[in-house]
Amino acid sequence: MQPKPLLIPRRALAGVVLPLMGLAARPAQAARIFRFDHTQGRLEFTARHLQVLTSTGQFSRFACELSLDPARPETARVAVQVETGSIAHAYPGAADLLRSPAYFDAERWPMARFSGSARPGGRIEAFDLAGPLELRGVTQPFTLQAKLARRRRDPATGAEIVDCTARGEISRAAFGMTADTLATGDRVQLAVLVSLVIS
């Protein structure tokens, strides 16, 4: 099922859209709170196998809250919660394996959490969010590279949409997931993808 675009009031997104359109920035304003979940976006993970193949799965239940002042992206903050048992995967049996104690151990650790703040030097079009990632009872530093990827117009409705992404990488061994090291690589790519309707 395709995720529904997140409906955000036009006024709330004005400060985000204007820089993308090359227009003059508005005066500084208070940070806005944007909330979205699995009904409006996707949270994917990708692993490499046998140094040749890749596979991608999703978490079908998660929630995210982003605090963002478009005039000061360096003050952005994000909080994400993920239900680790909500894994969906195309390969038969993969979801059950990933929920097992060898991987996410979803029964014992049903939630993963990330809380990040923007690093200095970012722009509204691209900025890093860094902070602790808690997974399987282990907490490690983690960074998401957030981008406002592109603007487009929905040909069916005429609505203007901004596509946003946030990507990062973890070592699964750092969180205690050391099974099947000969078949599956240690580095796992994480990606959040969401579409914002602005008009």
Q: How would you label these PLM feature ranges?
A:
Residues 10-11, 172:
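Short, cationic motifs built from Arg/Lys/His that form the positively charged side of catalytic pockets
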Residues 1-8, 15-22:
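N-terminal secretory signal peptides
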Residues 29-199:
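Low-complexity, acidic/polar, glycine-enriched regions of mature
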